[in-house]
Amino acid sequence: MSIHIGAKENEIAQTVLLPGDPLRAKYIAENFLEDAKCYNEVRGMYGFTGYYKGKRVSVQGTGMGVPSLSIYVNELINSYNVKNLIRIGTCGSLQPDIKLRDIVIAMSSSTDSAINKIRFNGMDYAPTASFKLLKKAYDKAMELGIQPKVGNILTTDTFYNDDPDSWKLWAKFGVLAVEMETAGLYTLAAKYNVDALTILTVSDSLVTGEATTAEERQKTFMNMVKIALEIAE
């Protein structure tokens, strides 16, 4: 057991899907995995291990933001020897051609978080996806008839920004979408020499102001889940 994850040795698979919402983790386990067993309920952050097409896979909620995700990723890697981490979550579109429910695969993640500034003594680090997982996800999406958008995203620490137009600068430089975790995930994956990828579904658009409901975000954004499960090793 680790501090925040109550699993015993060998209860977590080498590939873990990482939704921010623990209820989404529960939904995925109940609707996609066979023989799913709950290994964690600490702080209500559900974790399950089961099988998808014969492959052993875990799904672990992380909570919102880089600090919360970093706790779970550190413990999954260092206490449970996890090798493949696939974040599945929602994002806000920053581009007019990226619509609600589109799939975004994060090739890299810019960030306004200070966490890497502190880690790298004020210098800039470029958090980047595992090419192995990225290529597999892109190829699988195309095979499934899903056209993903692939590129740089923004990981932000601020959900409610005092400047409602701050996103426009990032959009000008081609950033596809905004969320709150990926830069932390990719940095830790690089630090510990494991593979990580983020696959996102667009839940709202900063360009048009459109948005989906909370219930829809929890239960119907399943193309990203299918892609993630299909590339699990």
Swiss-Prot record:
Residues engaged in binding phosphate: G20, R24, R43, R87, I88, G89, T90
EC numbers: 2.4.2.1
GO cellular component, one term: cytosol
Molecular function in Gene Ontology: purine-nucleoside phosphorylase activity
UniProt-annotated site: Important for catalytic activity, residues: R217
Chain positions recorded as a purine D-ribonucleoside binding sites: H4, E179, M180, E181, S203, D204
Top EC class of this enzyme: transferase
Keyword Glycosyltransferase: yes
Active-site residues from the entry: D204 (proton donor)
Signal sequence coordinates: none
Family indicated by similarity: Belongs to the PNP/UDP phosphorylase family.
Function: Catalyzes the reversible phosphorolytic breakdown of the N-glycosidic bond in the beta-(deoxy)ribonucleoside molecules, with the formation of the corresponding free purine bases and pentose-1-phosphate.
Designated name of the protein: Purine nucleoside phosphorylase DeoD-type
